[in-house]
Structures are given as structure tokens and as C-alpha cells.
Curated annotation (Swiss-Prot):
It comes from Listeria monocytogenes serotype 1/2a (strain 10403S). This is Probable ethanolamine permease EutH. Pfam families: EutH. Disulfide bonds: none annotated. Belongs to the EutH family. The keyword Manganese does not apply. The lineage of its organism: Bacteria, Bacillati, Bacillota, Bacilli, Bacillales. It is found in: Cell membrane. GO terms for cellular component: plasma membrane.
């Protein structure tokens, strides 16, 4: 039995435990987690099905522009899809359509698509809707720290998947270039960059909704609004598969949080964060939204470290696990390893950036005190 199969069986065991707990009245809290996993189907449908339905059409439109640029850089055009889109928000489907080789399609769809795409299309726009304005600078610094290590996470994830190192390095060229441009933007114009990502995120929601409605009309009436789209049933089947895995994954994360609470809190203290920040990092493994809701109660250092960690590591035991299990089971373990390596190395960069920021703030305070004196 492969490690990927072991992970699936583990999810199934926790799904069964969650279902039993739901039947007996949610005595242990697992029943609520089981229900939450199944209920995720609605929000996943809104985010994913439209883009999956439109993927063949988007590939046809984008290919003449993307293919020459990426092939000139020695990379596969599939990398373009998940530089901008999350794996579970249509990035995987678009990567498969654009891919020139199956390996590059999987590398882009399952590994890069669980790190770079989600940051741009989901993490930043969603975080901005939750966090306070005074925390924007911590968001920008955290995202900057996290993006620096995405190529490291992709490299390790690709090697664990057994892809050729030459193929990995070639395909990382455009990623490193895009990451460098984003980092420069966040360094010099953080507010402008963040605003740009938000507009892009809203644009993706519009396209996804159009795709969903066009697919629904075709399914229900037989009328083709957009020629060349994939049947909507394909996207709905993927979403259903993800929800089944999430029913187990959410139960697993719930148990991990309960059992390993003390050691995880100790780890937070070692990193120099308060307890809320340590809890935020644990929550991020399933979903980054609760972490962003807790951000206001974290210390400065904890805010930066949490956001940095979330860039690669968010959803590793949540949506991204569910999605990968549904579309490419062989990529489960490489995806988990890649995301965790990206997240842990981002924490190291985040600590450095936080120390730098806190030193600057201290120097400013001392100057202000001297001026007042």
C-alpha cells in the first residue's frame, strides 16, 4: 500500500468516526466537523465548477499568448494557469488543458497550484475582507516572506513526486520571475499590489459565476451559451469527491488540534509568538480563514509568521488534500511535503522579516522620544 493510499484510508476512518458521532448527537465534536466537510460542497461549487467548465475555452483563448512566452523560457505553459489560479479554483483543470506533457500538468496543477495560485486568487482578497486596515502591513510582509519560499516548496514537492530535476528547474524559471516581481511590488508598493490582487480575485469570481451559469443552462435546457465548454457534471463530480475527503480531513484536524494542543503551543512560544498566534498556525493547516479572524489578537511577530506560513501551508489538511485526493491521488504525499516545506521555510523568512520590522519600529519610537524630550 502506497503512502497516498494510507492517507486516503486515514481520511475514510475519520469520516466514519465523524459520521458515527453525528448519529449519536455530536458528543465528541467530530459530528460537526463531518457535517462541515460535506457542507463545503456549496462554496466549492461556486469557486470551482464554473472555471472547470470554462477550462477548455480559456485554454483555447490563452494558448496563442501563453504557449510562445513559456516555451521561450523553456517552461511548460501549464505553469501559467496555477501561477494565477488555485488548484481547486480551476487552476488544475486549466493546467491540464495547457500542459504539453502530463508531468508538467501534474507539477503545475497539484504542486504549484496549491501554493502560488491560492495566494493571489484567494488568500490576499479574503484576508483583506477580514483583517483590520492597520494589519495590512503585516499581511504584505507575511505574503512577501511566503512567496520567497514557494520555489523551494515546489522543488521538494516535485522531487518527492519523482519528476525529473531538469523538468522541475526549467518550469521554476517563470515562477521565480513572477515571484520576484510580486516581491518587488510588495516591497515598494504594498497597498497598490494588494489592491490589484483584490481586483483580480473579484474578476475570477465573475468568470467562475458566468461559467457555472452557462454550464447549468446547457445541462438543464440543452442550449449552448458558450461553445466548447466542458459538461458541468465533471466539475460537480470533482466537488463531490472533495467534500467526501473533507468530511474525514476536518475530523482529523480537529483531533490533531485537541491531542497535540500543548506541544503546538510550546512550539509557538519557541518561535516567540503569543498563544493566539500559535493556535492560528494550527488552524491554517485546515483553512486560513479562522487564522485571519484571529489575526487582530496576535502579537506583531505572530502576525507576520502566520501569514508567511499560510502562503504555502494553508489548506494542506483541508481543501487541497480533498481536491488532490479527488483528481490525482498519486500527488497527495508530494503536495503535502511541498506545502509543508514551503510553509516551514517561510516561517524562517518571516522571523527574519519580523525582527527587521520590530527593530525599525523600535528605532522610530526612540527617535520620537528623543525629539519630544
Amino acid at each position: 500500500m502506497s503512502i497516498n493510499e494510507i492517507i486516503i484510508y486515514l481520511m475514510v476512518i475519520f469520516m466514519i468516526l465523524g459520521a458515527i458521532d453525528k448519529i449519536i448527537g455530536n458528543k465528541f465534536g467530530l459530528g460537526a466537523q463531518f457535517e462541515e466537510g460535506i457542507m463545503a460542497m456549496g462554496s466549492l461549487t461556486l469557486a470551482m465548477v464554473g472555471i472547470i467548465t470554462l477550462a477548455p475555452v480559456l485554454a483555447k483563448i490563452l494558448s496563442p499568448i501563453v504557449v510562445p512566452i513559456y516555451t521561450a523560457l523553456g517552461a511548460d505553459p501549464a505553469m501559467f494557469a496555477t501561477t494565477l489560479l488555485a488548484n481547486d479554483m480551476g487552476g488544475f483543470a486549466l493546467a491540464q488543458e495547457l500542459a504539453l506533457t502530463p508531468d508538467a500538468g501534474l507539477f503545475a496543477g497539484a504542486i504549484l497550484g496549491s501554493m502560488m495560485g491560492p495566494t493571489i486568487v484567494f488568500t490576499i482578497p479574503v484576508a483583506l475582507g477580514i483583517i483590520k486596515k492597520e494589519d495590512h502591513k503585516y499581511l504584505a510582509t507575511g505574503v512577501l516572506s511566503g512567496i520567497i519560499t514557494i520555489p523551494i516548496g515546489c522543488l521538494i514537492g516535485g522531487l518527492v513526486a519523482g519528476f525529473s530535476p531538469i523538468m522541475i528547474f526549467k518550469n521554476l524559471v517563470p515562477i521565480i520571475l513572477v515571484a520576484a516581481l510580486i516581491m518587488l511590488g510588495l516591497w515598494f508598493k504594498p497597498e497598490g499590489m494588494i489592491k490589484g490582487f483584490t481586483i483580480f480575485g473579484k474578476g475570477v469570481v465573475i468568470v467562475a459565476t458566468i461559467g457555472l451559469v452557462a454550464g447549468a443552462i446547457q445541462q438543464l435546457t440543452g442550449l449552448t451559451i458558450i461553445p466548447g465548454i466542458a459538461p458541468i457534471g465533471e466539475g460537480i463530480e470533482i466537488v463531490g469527491g472533495i467534500a467526501l475527503v473533507l468530511a474525514g480531513a476536518f475530523c482529523l484536524v480537529f483531533v490533531i488540534t485537541k491531542v497535540f494542543n500543548k506541544p503546538l503551543m510550546k512550539m509557538g512560544k519557541l518561535l516567540g509568538m503569543n498563544e493566539v498566534a500559535a493556535a492560528g498556525m494550527v488552524a491554517t493547516l485546515a483553512n486560513s480563514i479562522p487564522m485571519f479572524q484571529m489575526l487582530k489578537d496576535m502579537d506583531e511577530r505572530g502576525k507576520i509568521i502566520n501569514v508567511a506560513f499560510a502562503v504555502s501551508a494553508a489548506f494542506v489538511l483541508g481543501d487541497h488534500l480533498g481536491f488532490t485526493a479527488g483528481v490525482a491521488q498519486d500527488m497527495i504525499f508530494p503536495m503535502i511535503v511541498g506545502k509543508l516545506v514551503g510553509g516551514v521555510t517561510a516561517v524562517a523568512v518571516g522571523i527574519y522579516m519580523a525582527n527587521r520590522m520590530m527593530k525599525k519600529n523600535k528605532a522610530k519610537e526612540q527617535t520620537a522620544v528623543k525629539d519630544n524630550g
